[in-house]
Amino acid sequence: MSKKARRRARRPSAAAPTVPAYRVFVGHASTDKWIATVLCEKIESTGASTFRDDRDIKSGDDIPDGIRREIIRSRELVVLLSPDSVNRAWVQFEAGAFYGRRRNARIIAVLCHVEFDTIPDMIKSKKAISINQFDEYVKELAGRIRGTCR
């Protein structure tokens, strides 16, 4: 193989977009879409990619399959708990599926106008944060991505 051919083979293909290695699944109720969008923007500022079902599952796609696929791809779950979402079946499904994937999964419950005692049982053992502490989480996430924080 010529030198030129070897160089060309090493270059990433334009047809194959690169996906950041660190992906965060953001679970939320549809009524909290605006807040979830802001959380995704902050997460993406670290270099991570995000999944949000209302944005990333297309019309006609199978919703549970799409969620399961993204849960497998994601390293962390940020679940926005609000008065509208805390008892919603989809939020419970996402948290349960992520927790079931591996017991030591990093699940961050972000509380927005709800109390700590409203956190679903399956993720109560995980440290939750207030929406007002989200920037601190983003700093920790950036450290994990750079490999400087656990």
Say what each PLM segment does.
Residues 115-126:
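Glycine-rich, charge-decorated loop segments at or immediately adjacent to ligand/cofactor-binding or catalytic sites
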Residues 1-80, 99-106, 113, 136-150:
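Conserved N-terminal substructure of TIR/SEFIR domains
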Residues 22-24, 37-40, 90-93, 121-122, 124-127:
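Short amphipathic alpha-helical segments
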Residues 69, 96-97, 124-125:
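Alpha-helix boundary/capping detector
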Residues 83-103, 117:
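Conserved TIR/SEFIR loop-to-helix hotspot centered on a Trp-containing motif
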Residues 128-133:
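Short acidic-hydrophobic, aromatic-tinged amphipathic segments that line or gate anion-handling sites
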Residues 55, 59, 87-90, 108, ...:
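Short, surface-exposed helix-loop/turn micro-motifs enriched in polar/charged residues
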